[in-house]
Amino acid sequence: MKKILSVCVCALLAFTLSAQENPEKKPKKKTAQVPANRANDHFVVQLGYTNWSGIPDSITKSGLSKSINAYFMLDYPFKTNPKLSIGIGLGIGSDHITFTKTYVGIKDLTPTFQFTNQSDTNHFKKTKLATSYLEAPIELRFTSDPSTGKGFKAALGVKVGTLINAHTRNTKFQNKAGTSINEFVMKESSKRFFNKTRISATARFGIGHISLYGAYQFTALLKDGSGPEVRPYSIGISLSGL
């Protein structure tokens, strides 16, 4: 009996030592493979309608105000899920707001930015106020088909910009009856009334290389106390590729 017990104990010790010397290897966690030909949407061009939130009734807008943006983006896919990525870029964003029979005093020495209705006197029929920014967008992106880039795509993000130009363009000088006086074009430029930095929320949703986009500016267009507290927003078509 003692011999049998001794043999069992020795066998148990031998098995224990063997298990310690050859621990069970855990399988490595597999990571998703990022396709070598992944569509990265390096170039993004946007054309849309733009407007101001908070615009007072005293300011008369007309026509189709537009937004034009162009960015070069770098795309960093998640190793654990190539359908998700972070896009970071640099480019130019511009807004073009149109007014009718309104004097836009961009170069005036007044303490506030003046928008004056001149329909009852000589006036320019059309005035365009254009602002341009050097912008750095960042997006959280999703694509349903990262290999071809032809499936559903979505992106949410923010963009930070610094003002590089603000100017007005006035055309078709008329009298109050609408009769043309002169066809000359008057341009004026000044950044005095404008906030130098803008921060905007952005979104894109679409199929393949064509998407709908929207943007809303968190920061006010004009400096505090320089005019109405308006915030630009835009919606339009976004083209992306490469």
Residue ranges and their predicted role:
Residues 28-41, 77-84, 145-152, 167:
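Short loop/turn motifs that connect adjacent beta-strands in outer-membrane beta-barrel proteins
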Residues 56-63, 98-131, 163-175, 181-200:
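Extracellular/periplasm-exposed beta-strand and loop segments of Gram-negative cell-envelope proteins
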